[in-house]
Regions:
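Membrane-proximal helix-turn-helix segments that form the acceptor-binding/catalytic region
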Residues: 84, 103-114, 120, 126, ...
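Carbohydrate-associated surface elements
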Residues: 166, 187
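Acidic anion/phosphate-binding donor-loop and adjacent secondary structure
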Residues: 172-173, 178, 188-205, 210, ...
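Conserved donor-binding/catalytic core segment of Leloir-type glycosyltransferases
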Residues: 206-233, 246
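Nucleotide-sugar-dependent
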Residues: 224, 281-286, 293-313, 324-332
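Nucleotide-activated donor-binding/catalytic signature segment of Leloir-type glycosyltransferases, i.e.
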Residues: 257-284
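Conserved acidic donor-binding segment of nucleotide-sugar-dependent glycosyltransferases
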Residues: 336-347, 356-362
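A short, well-ordered alpha-helix in the C-terminal region of glycosyltransferases
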Residues: 349, 356, 363-377, 389
Length: 397
């Protein structure tokens, strides 16, 4: 089967898109993917069974709302035209579209008229995301407009997927789509993220010369509330002089600069190290060298209702115990015996949790094992089968 796919992201950097494309290739399907083009990338490229068609646009992080609107609109127009051209050549059975933005699903108008079924993959819930980023009211014109686009997009799609049950339930409060929406989680890829026994030897409280390593990877964004995390780290160092933190990833340039300035002003540059983003294949080895995963979030309407950080799931899959901001979505999957929660605005509580886990290696081991068991029903092989079933049902219907 040949499948068309559209995403406003880079390939293969978007992990969810990459995993789905590779899953399709594994069963012999061919994918024509339309996406963004970064500097130095080829306009067209074949990666396995994935034909990548990159449009001459880049994503600019940290821009204002008007900048995002202009970027999304430009991508929509180019993707609409590119997908139409590809459709006349291949006549797809299914076309899958990933949000953001929601209205990107309408790039499939031509293939849908010609008989293709449309699968909309909702990575995020846009109205609440804009509330989180821009502080808009749920009674504002902008919020209502975003809800309108969401409702129109979900009504237009033949089937809908989303990333966790909390975001699904929120969609259902304002969209009558229970008959066509399913959850396919961002479960870690077991080819890379697999528990194989203890990684770094857990340092005891008596071995002060051995570093106790905290680890974080992924985007560095304001809504992840690194200020509290760094303050908590600084407090914990009073009890753990050997404490270290490695942060891998990129993010909003202005915010990243603020975070690095805070580290420099507190003379922590030797203890908190920033690294460039690395390919997903390299992340597991870095996790194995860590003693504790760090997952900070700022609790707001978006994060608390729908956000389940993929990095946390990757730490769980690798058997790395984690400290995480207490947010509703994470608590709906894990309890306090599986993840060490702290109030999102309490560096004191974070520091207390870090010190407690440092002093109790057996507690870290028990927490990691319980988290692995808790997430077993959501592992990728199960999600992959669900993804295949959705596509097969679309073809048969």
């Amino acid at each position: 089967m040949r499948i068309g796919m559209v995403v406003h992201a880079y390939y293969p950097h978007d992990v969810r898109v990459r995993r789905q494309c590779e899953a399709l290739a594994d069963r012999g399907d061919t994918v024509d993917l339309v996406c963004l083009r970064a500097d130095g990338e080829a306009a067209t490229e074949r990666v396995g069974n994935v034909n990548v068609h990159r449009l001459p646009l880049k994503h600019e992080r940290g821009q204002g709302a008007l900048g995002y609107i202009a970027e999304y609109t430009s991508f929509f127009i180019l993707a609409f035209l590119k997908l139409a051209m590809l459709t006349f050549r291949h006549r797809y059975r299914v076309v899958q579209v990933h949000n953001l933005p929601d209205f990107l699903v309408f790039t499939t108008l031509v293939p849908k008229i010609l008989g293709a079924r449309v699968l909309l993959d909702m990575h995020d819930i846009t109205p609440e995301l804009f509330q989180s980023i821009y502080g808009i009211s749920d009674r504002s014109v902008v919020f209502r407009l975003l809800v309108f686009f969401e409702q129109a997009s979900l009504a237009y799609a033949d089937r809908v997927m989303t990333v966790n049950r909390n975001i699904r339930d929120l969609f259902l409060t304002r969209n009558p789509i229970a008959h066509k929406i399913e959850v396919v989680m961002n479960a870690p890829d077991p080819r890379y993220f697999r528990y194989s026994g203890p990684g770094a030897s857990p340092p005891s409280a008596m071995k002060k010369e051995e570093p106790f390593r905290l680890f974080h990877h992924g985007q560095i964004l304001r809504r992840y509330n690194f200020e509290t995390a760094l303050e908590g780290f600084s407090l914990a160092r009073k009890a753990i002089p050997s404490l270290e933190l490695d942060i891998y990833g990129d993010g909003e340039e202005k915010y990243l600069s603020e975070v690095k300035t805070w580290v420099a002003n507190h003379d922590l540059e030797g203890r908190i190290r920033f690294h460039d983003r690395v390919p997903v294949e390299q992340v597991p080895e870095l996790i194995r060298q860590a003693d504790l995963g760090l997952v900070p979030c700022k609790k707001d309407v978006f994060v608390d209702k729908v956000m389940l950080p993929v990095r946390l799931l990757e730490y769980v899959a690798m058997g790395l115990p984690s400290v995480c901001s207490r947010v509703g979505t994470v608590e709906s999957y894990f309890d306090d015996t599986e993840v060490s929660f702290y109030d999102h605005n309490s560096p004191e509580q974070l520091a207390k949790n870090i010190v407690r886990l440092y002093r109790n290696p057996s507690l870290r081991d028990r927490m990691a094992q319980k988290a692995i068991k808790a997430f077993r029903s959501c592992e990728w092989p199960r999600m992959q089968k669900r993804y295949y079933r959705i596509l097969d049902q679309m073809i048969c219907s």
